[in-house]
Amino acid sequence: MGTDAQVKRGSDVYSMQCAACHDAQLAGSGTAPALAGTDFAANWKDENVGSLFERIRATMPADNPGSLKRDQVADLIAFILNFNKYPTAQKELPTDFEALKAIKITAPK
């Protein structure tokens, strides 16, 4: 989900805004959940990308909630999903909540 360029931008956002708490490998820490692997899959199973987008947009980063721009959040989600083995696409993930809500988070193929 998301283009290669969007995943790269998301990786940059993650490194600057998220890795200190969630770990460089998205493994999480005592205070921040894992964003990869079985923990991520269990936490977001059968949810939609819109819910993930809104959670990140409204509550992250923890030291400055709501400070990320909508395009940064979409880029970040593209990176997180790609890290979790979701394939990239020809189109970028949108920043529109309704469009994102239609995308279910299921096990990658």
Which ranges hold each PLM region?
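Gly/Gly-Pro-rich "capping" loops immediately C-terminal to redox-active cysteine motifs
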Residues: 27-61
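The canonical Cys-X-X-Cys-His
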Residues: 10, 14-25, 76, 80
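Non-catalytic cap/lid and distal C-terminal segments of serine-dependent acyl enzymes
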Residues: 6, 16, 23, 31, ...
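Flexible coil segments in periplasmic/lumen-exposed cytochrome c-class electron-transfer proteins
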Residues: 65-109
